Amino acid sequence: MQLITEQVQKSMEGSSWIRKMFEKGLELKTRYGADAVCDFSLGNPDVPPPAVTKDVLETIAADAVKPLGLGYCPNAGIPAVREAMAQYINRQQGIHDSEVRCNAGHVVMTVGAAGALVSFFRAVIEPGDEVVCPAPYFVEYASYCGHFGGVLKTVPSKSEDFSPDIEGLAAAITPRTRALLVNSPNNPTGAIYSAEVMAKIAKLVDDVNAARGESGRPLYLLSDEPYRAFAYDGVTVAPVLPLTKWSIVLGSFSTTLSLAGERVGYIALNPAMPGVETLAAAVTLTNRTLGYVNAPVIGQRLVAGLLDTTVDLGIYDRRRKLMAEVLTAAGVEFAMPKGAFYFFVKAPGGDDLAFTDALYEERILVVPGRGFGGPGYVRLSCSVDEQIIARSAEGFKRAVAKMKG
């Protein structure tokens, strides 16, 4: 008896390496105790939310007992929250041109950035359509577009700094390509794409759309930005909306406010985009018909009250620097991440599975890079206490020595 679809069965059998390492981590922690395991496998933000979160929640709680205090809201989100988000995005993107300034009508509140992507793909993808993105990439992208018969096409990035290969992206685009998806700061590499690179990507999108003409289906530039606030060493994250009218920004507050469980995100459409009202209406519809209905009301109001603050990003920077010291002392090769809170490091000898196993024997959990389209590397998350990072130092040395021996 076939209980589930072949597509889901295949997905279950090839479950993500993050999930596999999570399960292996549970085995280690059960056997040796949680304090004896250094778990760098999950990107679960652990820094406390801003202190003002409590005050905002108290205000929300007072309103919650009023009639419809926690009732349905418009499918696109609470109007006042959408307007606040629009102004936040304008500031974040450095938008001063009135033609490109967002208002509430250009913003849809979603169930996390993931919900934004899924709702967008449902609105624009037909079976056989393609989404092109640089690799390594966030592991779930393929599933998000695959739900609707879409195909994720990945293009290897430049190995020295994980910068996108512009020529490779251009070569991957076909008449069936509906979106070019970028993620900067990047998960899993921590790379931040330069303003020059982003300008070239935007020009590529404009050139493709010029060739397709007004009667063709447009190519969209999707910028997935949940880690935008996580930029170090004076590096800035290039804005996308001013670069091309075909740009769309997605984001969430899982990391910047440590609200991962609240599942609040957004999608912001470029106001200068032809047909922007139609696309906004379509994403609002798919946000509802996919079963999300509307983003969580408490989460929306909470985010609106916290837009001018973030978690203590200095904590993540200190962890980043400590992790770099540990890896350097162990002889691990890596590009220093400029953003997010991940390291994507070379596996000695190029075998990411063998390196993952060697670290596992030292009770250190990482994720093989092949799970992100980057074989030969492993991903480490710095969303852990500094004591755990320091405690892993000798284990890294032994694992590297074993790989090189």
Question: What residue spans do the PLM features occupy?
Answer:
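Conserved core segment of the aminotransferase class I/II
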Residues: 245-317
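N-terminal small-domain helix-loop-helix segment of the aminotransferase-like
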Residues: 4, 8-112, 119, 299, ...
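Short beta-strand
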Residues: 37-39, 250, 333-338, 370-371
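Conserved core of the PLP fold type I
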Residues: 67-216, 228-243, 389, 394
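PLP-dependent enzyme catalytic core of the Aspartate aminotransferase-like
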Residues: 87, 91, 170, 354-357, ...
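Conserved glycine-rich beta-strand-loop-beta hairpin in the small C-terminal domain of fold type I
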Residues: 297-304, 316-327, 334-346, 376
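Alpha-helix termini
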Residues: 27-33, 92-97, 204-218, 271-276, ...
